[in-house]
Swiss-Prot record:
Belongs to the GPI family. InterPro entries: G6P_Isomerase, G6P_Isomerase_C, Phosphoglucose_isomerase_CS, SIS_dom_sf, SIS_PGI_1, SIS_PGI_2. It catalyses: alpha-D-glucose 6-phosphate = beta-D-fructose 6-phosphate. Gene3D superfamilies: 1.10.1390.10, Glucose-6-phosphate isomerase like protein, domain 1. This is Glucose-6-phosphate isomerase. The lineage of its organism: Bacteria, Pseudomonadati, Pseudomonadota, Gammaproteobacteria, Pseudomonadales. Its EC number is 5.3.1.9. Catalyzes the reversible isomerization of glucose-6-phosphate to fructose-6-phosphate.
Length: 554
């Protein structure tokens, strides 16, 4: 029976008990000692695939740990789950849908059926539609209401319609096509809208409204504001079609807004928002970096799909990262995971992975609705490079919580300045090294004595300089951030999240928790503006409504 039809209690599996026993045996495991004892440890726990190099040797593991974790993957039938995902089975049980974001990067000629229909021709038809639009804009053939070419594209969307495209278009800024600037408008905050439109001219701006339903509150409000701004700047209703296109499955609503049918790019219910950057949601990416680079992005993701499906689990990058996350979250008590990119252009990867991981695996019931019996997804957080070293890395080094980390770093910078990149790379490696090595009390005391301190001073200060070490991390190295390697990197994290959902028996492809706040928000809004006089469901919310109404002006 498929994993999503009969979810298991993972804690009842023999492999889980074996890992519990192994965890006790690893209580006094020291990475420092493990490296000293085994000169081959680095070679034993590194892996290269799809343009990515993974060093996972700085983890609280040995060969037995890896074997036991792979045994757990086998007991939950991970192989069958991967096949179900790629074959288009109904892995999203609560919504009765497959999750086929991987279809978006499959090559021409592949076949994949959904409800008896081969979807691949439609996938490539839309890709051709994107190619045509991108070509017309880059060639200056798409013109605004004053017949000037488009110079700015604004993507109006939130969540998966924003985070993935923003990550990729900024990460690949070095591949940006001249003549077209891409911007993102997501939050329902007038200040964001104001600051953005200050930079734009309506006559040369194209808005992409990205919303599957064409009814997402934040997106619709921003689209309406953009429409009003366009008209106020001199645009006309008759020429509106030149300045607004849509990515949506609600054609009727988009047409009613003023968008022409031929300028509506479809979305499919078998692609979730946080997995959608490979689809027409990626239009701003293609406009930013060009169509050939966008196809390279898809190709890189496809190579990771192939690796994920074919590599043995002990040599499978997404599988190993997922199992390490299970190891720390379920057996070492880790509650969060840090993503630490040492690259300015990758500064938004943490935001994308927050949605990808936390919206997917922030679940407390299994696929069949029964409660989970163990912790599931961690809090994902982090930030870029050396900035974090002067902020929150202190907690990683000397705090009381175990927080695994992923360091992501390129070997080559697109913008070399003196020896900056060598220092950046050195800082990345030294941070992972410091997390692993730490500093013992005798080492701290010796260091202070070498500085000429009195013994009394040494004894007072040394405990503050002790760093526990033995803190786990992975290091992901790429030669240089390119469309292909970035595609592989993002797809790797998608598959990592899926593997963990299989282990825990949860649904990685729904997000019912997001819906409750939306539903309650309507009632709160109606009370704020006075169209609903009944009190809110609780005194705190009503009190805050009253506070707003008593003070709000304008």
């Amino acid at each position: 029976m498929a994993y999503y039809r009969t979810p298991h209690d993972v804690t009842a599996l023999p492999a889980w008990q074996a890992l519990k026993d192994h965890r006790q045996a690893m209580q006094d495991f020291s990475m420092r000692e493990a490296f000293n004892a085994d000169p081959q440890r680095f070679n034993q726990f590194t892996l290269s695939s799809c343009g990515l190099f993974l060093d996972y040797s700085k983890n609280l593991i040995n060969a037995e740990t890896r074997n036991l974790l792979v045994g757990l993957a086998n007991e939950v039938d991970l192989k069958g789950a991967i096949k179900a995902l790629f074959d288009g089975e109904i892995v999203n049980s609560s919504e009765g849908r497959p999750a086929l974001h991987t279809a978006l990067r499959r090559p021409v000629g592949d076949k994949l059926s959904v409800n008896g229909v081969n979807v691949m021709p439609e996938v490539h038809k839309v890709l051709n539609q994107i190619t045509d639009l991108v070509g017309r804009i880059h060639d200056g053939l798409w013109r605004g209401y004053t017949e000037k070419p488009i110079t700015d594209v604004v993507n109006i969307g939130i969540g998966g319609s924003f985070l993935g495209p923003e990550l990729v278009s900024e990460a690949l800024l070095s591949y940006a096509q001249k003549g077209v600037r891409c911007h993102y408008l997501a939050n329902i905050d007038g200040s964001e809208f104001h600051e953005l439109t200050q930079k734009l001219r309506a006559e040369t701006t194209l808005f992409i409204v990205s919303s599957k339903s064409f009814n997402t509150l934040e997106t619709l409000k921003n689209a309406q504001a953009a429409r009003a701004w366009y008209l106020a700047q001199g645009g006309s209703e008759a020429e509106l079609y030149r300045h607004f296109i849509a990515v949506s499955s609600n054609n009727a609503a988009a047409v009613a807004f003023g968008i022409r049918e031929e300028n509506i790019f479809p979305m499919w219910d078998w692609v979730g928002g946080r997995y959608s950057l490979w689809s027409a949601i990626g239009l701003p990416i293609a406009l930013a970096i060009g169509m050939s680079n966008f196809k390279e992005l898809l190709s890189g993701a496809y190579t990771m799909d192939q690796h994920f499906q074919s590599a043995p689990f002990e040599q499978n990058m997404p599988v190993l990262l997922a199992l390490l996350g299970v190891w720390y979250g379920n057996f070492w008590g880790a509650q969060s995971h840090a993503i630490l990119p040492y690259d300015h252009y990758l500064r938004n990867i943490t935001k994308h992975l927050q949605q990808l991981d936390m919206e997917s695996n922030g679940k407390s019931v299994r696929q069949d609705g029964t409660p989970v019996s163990t912790d599931t997804g961690p809090v994902i957080w982090g930030g870029v490079g050396c900035n974090g070293q002067h902020a929150y890395h202190q907690l990683l080094h000397q705090g009381t919580q175990l927080i695994p980390a992923d360091f992501i770093v390129p070997i080559v910078s697109f913008n070399p300045v003196s020896d900056h990149h060598q220092w950046l790379y050195a800082n990345c490696l030294s941070q992972s090294q410091a997390l692993m090595l730490g500093k013992t009390l005798p080492e701290a005391e010796a260091e202070l004595r070498d500085k000429g301190m009195s013994e009394d001073q040494v004894q007072k200060l040394a405990p503050h300089k002790v760093i526990p070490g033995n803190r786990p991390s992975n290091t992901l190295v790429v030669e240089r951030i390119s469309p292909r390697r970035l595609g592989a990197l993002v797809a790797m994290y998608e598959h990592k999240v899926f593997v963990q959902s299989v282990v825990w028996g949860i649904n990685a492809f729904d997000q019912w928790g997001v819906e409750l706040g939306k539903e309650l928000g309507k009632g709160v809004y109606n009370r704020l503006v006075g169209s609903e006089e009944t009190a809110a469901e609780d005194a705190s919310t009503q009190g805050l409504i009253n506070y707003f109404r008593g003070r709000h002006r304008g």
